[in-house]
Amino acid sequence: GAQLLALMGDRVPRAMLSGLPLQQQWSYRSTGDFAPDYYLETDADLYYYSFTDAHIAMTYRALTPQQQARLDPMITGFNPADMYAADHVRRVLTTFPGVFTGLGEFSVHKEFVSPKIAGDPPSLTDPALDRLLDFAGEVGLVTVLHNDIVMPFTPPENERAYLDELKAELAEHPN
């Protein structure tokens, strides 16, 4: 928090503060004593790291009210393919009242990241995402969603593979 504010200086009046939602698994069978800190350094899975939300909240609470006024903390430690995602967000809001402004940035279709995530990959057509977005709309959470429009190595006829799904999802959840 304080480091970000120092970096912002006087030129940036306000910024979004998000934790990293995915953690690279350190698989000894894959990398031995080398602890990977980037998703391309190993073939091991990525997993959703829910502690990131508590870390952001505690960091934010340690700031002065003037410093807090310049930051918008966001919830990111949920799996958008999990029907429990909305419940996780509700629990974070209850545990840290008044801290969080919204959700995100979280990814649904993200080129080389999505295939590395353990479990079901997020999808724009997943009811879990609908449930999450419905809850965000009900409680007034700003939502920042990252969704690639194209797939890697897409043939020209499928160039914008996810665009129609994205438009439909946004139309279904206008709030």
List PLM regions with ranges.
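Catalytic pocket-lining loop regions of alpha/beta-barrel enzymes
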Residues: 117-175
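Mid-domain alpha/beta scaffold segments of enzyme catalytic cores
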Residues: 1-131, 135
